[in-house]
Regions:
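Conserved pre-ATP/AMP-binding loop-to-beta segment of ANL
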Residues: 6, 21-24, 143, 159-162, ...
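AMP-binding/adenylate-forming catalytic core of the ANL superfamily
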Residues: 101, 118-120, 356, 376-382, ...
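Gly/Ser/Thr-rich phosphate-binding loop
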Residues: 247, 269-277, 286-344, 355, ...
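Structural core segment of the AMP-binding/adenylate-forming
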Residues: 11, 61-62, 85, 89-166, ...
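AMP-binding/adenylate-forming catalytic domain of the ANL superfamily
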Residues: 144, 496-517, 536-540
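Conserved AMP-binding/adenylation subdomain of ANL enzymes
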Residues: 209-225, 233-273, 288
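Conserved AMP-binding/adenylate-forming core of the ANL superfamily
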Residues: 5, 22-77, 81-85, 102-107, ...
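Conserved structural elements of the adenylate-forming
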Residues: 49-54, 182, 187, 201-222, ...
């Protein structure tokens, strides 16, 4: 009989449910959801374990074997966490998918991962239905009635769509944890695909176990009450908020999504003492109209990845908080700047046990102040490892020379403090997401009024370090009526929100090289010059 191991998610929850069955570990705030009358949802360790057993039994009943994959596509609901624990119990592999994903990106993710089924929110059913015909291996759908998508909820129980709620009403089964090792995979988290198709990072149970231990890195206290509105499909919400809370017994609060206007009210309502944010979120929060009670909140610490140096100290003063800055990626690499230490704008130094360097194109370490790629490996000198699902070549390139190649460009100062500057190759990072321009170009190119399109990035108006706004350079069909508003509408229909261009740049032609490669520098020069050809959603 295998000994239980808290590095395995299923074991952790089973043990905590035995120790503290009535402890209310999860709260899902539903302020502003639906008609505003929905009560918050709470899960104790005991209820979390019971529902995870029910979902695990449902996965096994649907024929999912060890290591087989299913999609998990929903906003922040308790059922998301329960499905994660269920995957660990059943030794299946979950594939978290942003619920805004649609079209070819959604189809590619499900197809590449070989998902046999999908657990989703009812508001995702239309997106899934639009691509289901191209996914012959997708045998089943378990849908959650969210209480906010009334028309979509009516689809549950029809056309191969089963009710997750019905599963959760079953008598509680006892599912023996089928995992054999913490190194068995728990999930495949797909990258944004900035340089091609998205790649699936295979994350073992032990990786989530390491997330659970990050509470010590972030300095969480025993009475901490964390909050996040970031999607649980994203590594940040799992690493900064969920993992440490489950492990340490912190009464954590989630909301369905991040809303800057309700952030502080949610923290006041639940007594939250810390929250997490990415990229341009800091500027969005700071841009809200000032209130007399801005600093009247229970938050002591904001765990940030990408706080703009320009507003860092003003943000702390206005809201009465301290900023804990950190850096990391799902593939690996972790650094942090303790509160009150190091220069403003730095993301810190690597955690103990990890080496992090700034290197040039030849792999030589850059001197202080010189920008190079951020790379990392174990401090023991062992080679870094990463596994991209079904992509051995990409896995090899990611760890060429034994170092994890982040693709991020940065520099260090003379005291070894590290700074992020931009994404290698000029890829677009917008509101924390790396944008695959090919998806954006495809949607715009299919618009009947568009003859040519090229998508690139410009420095974000938010000022967030490394962030860019999305520009779509467009040539319209000669003689055809052209409406920028209709292009924006098509983008909203075919893309997730972060992929929708910030600007449309209308041109007579897109400058290109002899090999038909668009010349971005000329487009950028024209954009910076302004003029009548630049449109935003408001101006269109």
């Amino acid at each position: 009989m295998r000994e239980r191991n808290e590095m395995i998610l299923a074991d952790l929850i089973t043990i905590r449910a035995e120790q503290r069955p009535d402890f209310d570990i999860l709260t899902f705030d539903r302020s502003g959801v639906g008609d505003g009358t929905l009560a918050d949802e709470v899960r104790t360790y005991g209820a979390l374990a019971e529902n995870a057993n029910r979902i695990a039994a449902a996965l096994i009943a649907r024929g999912l074997g060890r290591g087989e994959r299913f999609g998990l596509m929903m906003r922040n609901h308790p059922e998301f966490v329960e499905s994660m624990v269920a995957a660990s119990m059943a030794a299946c592999v979950l594939v978290p998918i942003d619920p805004r994903t649609r079209g070819e990106k959604l189809a590619y993710t499900l197809r590449n991962a070989g998902c046999r089924g999908i657990v989703c929110g009812d508001y995702c059913l239309e997106q899934i239905d639009a691509v289901r015909a191209s996914l012959p291996d997708l045998a089943w759908i378990l849908a959650l009635d969210s209480g906010e998508a009334h028309e979509a909820a009516a689809l549950i129980g029809r056309a191969g769509v089963d009710s997750l709620g019905a599963v959760l009403s079953w008598p509680v089964p006892t599912v023996d944890v089928r995992l054999e090792s913490p190194e068995d995979p728990l999930q495949i988290i797909y990258t944004s695909g900035t340089t091609g198709d998205p790649k699936g990072v295979v994350a073992p149970n032990s990786r989530f176990g390491l997330f659970a231990l990050l509470g010590a890195v972030f300095g969480y206290r025993p009475d901490e009450r964390p909050y996040t509105g970031l999607s649980l499909t994203h590594g940040n919400a799992q690493a900064v908020t969920l993992g440490p809370s489950l492990h340490m017994g912190l009464r954590v609060v989630f909301s369905r999504r991040f809303t800057k206007s309700r952030l502080w009210d949610i923290c006041r309502k639940h007594g939250c003492t810390t929250f997490s944010m990415l990229g341009g979120m800091a500027t969005a929060i700071y841009s809200e109209p000032a209130r007399e009670n801005d600093a009247d909140n229970p938050v002591r610490m904001v765990v940030s990845a990408g706080m703009p140096a320009a507003i860092w100290e003003s943000f702390e003063r206005r809201f009465g908080v301290s900023v804990f800055e950190w850096y990391g990626a799902i593939e690996g690499g972790l650094a942090f700047k303790p509160i009150g230490e190091g220069p403003i704008g730095s993301f810190g130094k690597p955690v103990p046990g990890l080496q992090m360097r700034i290197v040039d194109e030849q792999g030589e370490e850059c001197p202080p102040g010189v920008i190079g790629e951020i790379v990392s490996r174990p401090a023991t000198g062992e080679e870094a490892t990463v596994e991209y699902f079904r992509d051995a070549e990409a896995s090899r390139k990611k760890t060429a020379g034994g170092w994890l190649r982040s693709g991020d460009m940065g520099h260090r100062d003379v005291e070894g403090w590290l700074f992020f500057d931009y994404r290698k190759g000029g890829a677009i990072r917008h509101n924390g997401d790396f944008i695959n321009t090919s998806f954006v170009e495809k949607v715009i190119a299919e618009h009947p009024g568009v003859a040519d399109v090229y998508v690139y990035g410009v420095a974000a108006a938010s000022g967030a370090p490394g962030e860019k706004d999305v520009v779509a350079a467009i040539v319209s069909v000669p003689g055809a009526a052209f409406s920028p508003a209709s292009v924006f509408a098509a983008c909203h229909e075919g893309l997730e929100p972060n992929f929708v261009p910030t600007y449309l740049q209308i041109l007579e032609e897109i400058p290109k090289t002899a090999s038909e490669k668009p010349q971005e520098r000329f487009l950028l020069e024209r954009f910076q010059a302004g003029g009548s050809g630049i449109f935003t959603e408001k101006s269109s």
